[in-house]
Amino acid sequence: MKSFITRNKTAILATVAATGTAIGAYYYYNQLQQQQQRGKKNTINKDEKKDTKDSQKETEGAKKSTAPSNPPIYPVSSNGEPDFSNKANFTAEEKDKYALALKDKGNQFFRNKKYDDAIKYYNWALELKEDPVFYSNLSACYVSVGDLKKVVEMSTKALELKPDYSKVLLRRASANEGLGKFADAMFDLSVLSLNGDFNDASIEPMLERNLNKQAMSKLKEKFGDIDTATATPTELSTQPAKERKDKQENLPSVTSMASFFGIFKPELTFANYDESNEADKELMNGLSNLYKRSPESYDKADESFTKAARLFEEQLDKNNEDEKLKEKLAISLEHTGIFKFLKNDPLGAHEDIKKAIELFPRVNSYIYMALIMADRNDSTEYYNYFDKALKLDSNNSSVYYHRGQMNFILQNYDQAGKDFDKAKELDPENIFPYIQLACLAYRENKFDDCETLFSEAKRKFPEAPEVPNFFAEILTDKNDFDKALKQYDLAIELENKLDGIYVGIAPLVGKATLLTRNPTVENFIEATNLLEKASKLDPRSEQAKIGLAQMKLQQEDIDEAITLFEESADLARTMEEKLQAITFAEAAKVQQRIRSDPVLAKKIQETLAKLREQGLM
């Protein structure tokens, strides 16, 4: 599998608009420099590799010969150590000469693994002359004795004197990684690449490793309910995300909510409604808001279902044999359960829906429980709950539709097609089976059939934005971008004509994403406007935010990009999605730090200017 950096070079930090605006980041500049320097082999030499992996590397200037027999050229006290009592009278030339001799003496001790003595002589050399090599050698000594803090301290002093000291940058990066200061390590590695000292193959694995560690650390810091240090990608993708204790969990985007509940036939009433009962009124209010398709209605429904469940439980405690109360409580718990599931609380969802089934089994309760099982990757239980739902109502189209979805995911295409056909037969006014059948045909490489099925759906549902929106996704996958843009425009137009949310911001995000594939100035501006509009219309959409963050990054609005990436992490459903957003944010922070350094920022502009001159940009 490709590394995160390799996969996301463009998405993270790598695009330059046609105006030539610089989008600064280590990997992008490095990538362009590789084009400039094709064939040039700037790899880490053996000594440098040894320095990062083997503490016994020789310091700079060390000789292979044995210690010289001649007496030292610098003044010596009676104990054999340097005598600086007359240092004030040393000439500049003498200071340089003595310092070099002391450094050479330190090298002899280093070569003989007498690191404490080597450290003393390097420090004495520094008393006479501040030299980056002396600090570098000191840092190498501290590598050998395992004092990583001192490695960083001495490396920093060397870099203050010689900012482009490649060997020391690499050494400090390694030490910072060992100290858990991954962001600092990333910065040094980025500077190394920007300097063009090493090629992409040399630096990228180290940067990738530190970026992963930094992102994992931030993930654990913010959400802390998975062992991120040892988690595999599969564990991250299946681990339900638990928000911070100080932050209330929210519902997903209203676009997602409308899409999810749009599959079900609206249930706007229930048996034995008593308008004098506050619990009944809350349940009725919840059902009414659930199908209003407005931005605020889902939060209102959530609140009402929660209140209704609490009130019905109180009433049932006083009269636990009342079957009517049991049914009403079951309906309430069914809905609090699915809302908890959508808010990333699968355990709470399972508990509520299980209790609802025990009180009064309903088709939707079984469907929701099946979805919880699917979220756990338990396909066996998933199908079992659908079987139970069909025993209650063998003609419920939603059961067949959701079972078809699972078969589609598992690539059981024949069975998926049968389920979608049945759902379509049972509820011909539900648009989603039509769309899924068209998507299924495309998945089976039958584009003509796919197009025919979309045409059928369009004839039956001429005002439905779902048809052009999903067809645009298919056309995008087919690389038919011009037609896809037209379909997205049609979907946006149809959505705007309707009361309520149907496809929501999906066509706005889809069109923006498509525009960025042809990165002209005009397309970037339009894509940014579309994503800003999408984020305002649906503030809980992580897709809109992460897309907008990438645009802000490319426009050098790094602060805003970081904020949006971090907000995306809060909104994302799974740990894997959260990790990706955090990784983007941490990569952007490195870019921010590089560009805030005047020397590095100047170097970035110089590098890009050269590339423009050569026609590489």
Swiss-Prot record:
<feature type="repeat" description="TPR 2">
    <location>
        <begin position="134"/>
        <end position="165"/>
    </location>
</feature>
<comment type="similarity">
    <text>Belongs to the Tom70 family.</text>
</comment>
<dbReference type="InterPro" id="IPR005687">
    <property type="entry name" value="Tom70"/>
</dbReference>
<feature type="region of interest" description="Disordered">
    <location>
        <begin position="228"/>
        <end position="251"/>
    </location>
</feature>
<protein>
    <recommendedName>
        <fullName>Mitochondrial import receptor subunit TOM70</fullName>
    </recommendedName>
</protein>
<keyword id="KW-0597">Phosphoprotein</keyword>
<dbReference type="GO" id="GO:0045040">
    <property type="term" value="P:protein insertion into mitochondrial outer membrane"/>
</dbReference>
<dbReference type="InterPro" id="IPR019734">
    <property type="entry name" value="TPR_rpt"/>
</dbReference>
<dbReference type="Pfam" id="PF14559">
    <property type="entry name" value="TPR_19"/>
</dbReference>
<keyword id="KW-0677">Repeat</keyword>
<comment type="subunit">
    <text>Forms part of the TOM (translocase of outer membrane) complex that consists of at least 7 different proteins (TOM5, TOM6, TOM7, TOM20, TOM22, TOM40 and TOM70). In the complex interacts with TOM22. Interacts with TOM37.</text>
</comment>
<feature type="repeat" description="TPR 9">
    <location>
        <begin position="542"/>
        <end position="575"/>
    </location>
</feature>
<dbReference type="Pfam" id="PF13181">
    <property type="entry name" value="TPR_8"/>
</dbReference>
<feature type="topological domain" description="Mitochondrial intermembrane">
    <location>
        <begin position="1"/>
        <end position="10"/>
    </location>
</feature>
<keyword id="KW-1133">Transmembrane helix</keyword>
<keyword id="KW-0812">Transmembrane</keyword>
<comment type="function">
    <text>Component of the TOM (translocase of outer membrane) receptor complex responsible for the recognition and translocation of cytosolically synthesized mitochondrial preproteins. Together with TOM20 and TOM22 functions as the transit peptide receptor at the surface of the mitochondrion outer membrane and facilitates the movement of preproteins into the TOM40 translocation pore.</text>
</comment>
<dbReference type="GO" id="GO:0044233">
    <property type="term" value="C:mitochondria-associated endoplasmic reticulum membrane contact site"/>
</dbReference>
<dbReference type="GO" id="GO:0015450">
    <property type="term" value="F:protein-transporting ATPase activity"/>
</dbReference>
<dbReference type="Pfam" id="PF13432">
    <property type="entry name" value="TPR_16"/>
</dbReference>
<feature type="transmembrane region" description="Helical">
    <location>
        <begin position="11"/>
        <end position="30"/>
    </location>
</feature>
<keyword id="KW-0802">TPR repeat</keyword>
<feature type="repeat" description="TPR 5">
    <location>
        <begin position="397"/>
        <end position="430"/>
    </location>
</feature>
<dbReference type="InterPro" id="IPR011990">
    <property type="entry name" value="TPR-like_helical_dom_sf"/>
</dbReference>
<feature type="repeat" description="TPR 6">
    <location>
        <begin position="432"/>
        <end position="464"/>
    </location>
</feature>
<dbReference type="GO" id="GO:0030150">
    <property type="term" value="P:protein import into mitochondrial matrix"/>
</dbReference>
<dbReference type="GO" id="GO:0005741">
    <property type="term" value="C:mitochondrial outer membrane"/>
</dbReference>
<feature type="repeat" description="TPR 3">
    <location>
        <begin position="281"/>
        <end position="315"/>
    </location>
</feature>
<dbReference type="GO" id="GO:0005739">
    <property type="term" value="C:mitochondrion"/>
</dbReference>
<feature type="modified residue" description="Phosphoserine">
    <location>
        <position position="174"/>
    </location>
</feature>
<feature type="repeat" description="TPR 7">
    <location>
        <begin position="465"/>
        <end position="498"/>
    </location>
</feature>
<feature type="compositionally biased region" description="Polar residues">
    <location>
        <begin position="229"/>
        <end position="240"/>
    </location>
</feature>
<dbReference type="GO" id="GO:0030943">
    <property type="term" value="F:mitochondrion targeting sequence binding"/>
</dbReference>
<keyword id="KW-0496">Mitochondrion</keyword>
<keyword id="KW-1000">Mitochondrion outer membrane</keyword>
<dbReference type="GO" id="GO:0045039">
    <property type="term" value="P:protein insertion into mitochondrial inner membrane"/>
</dbReference>
<dbReference type="Pfam" id="PF00515">
    <property type="entry name" value="TPR_1"/>
</dbReference>
<feature type="repeat" description="TPR 4">
    <location>
        <begin position="363"/>
        <end position="396"/>
    </location>
</feature>
<feature type="compositionally biased region" description="Basic and acidic residues">
    <location>
        <begin position="44"/>
        <end position="63"/>
    </location>
</feature>
<dbReference type="GO" id="GO:0005742">
    <property type="term" value="C:mitochondrial outer membrane translocase complex"/>
</dbReference>
<feature type="region of interest" description="Disordered">
    <location>
        <begin position="36"/>
        <end position="87"/>
    </location>
</feature>
<feature type="repeat" description="TPR 1">
    <location>
        <begin position="99"/>
        <end position="132"/>
    </location>
</feature>
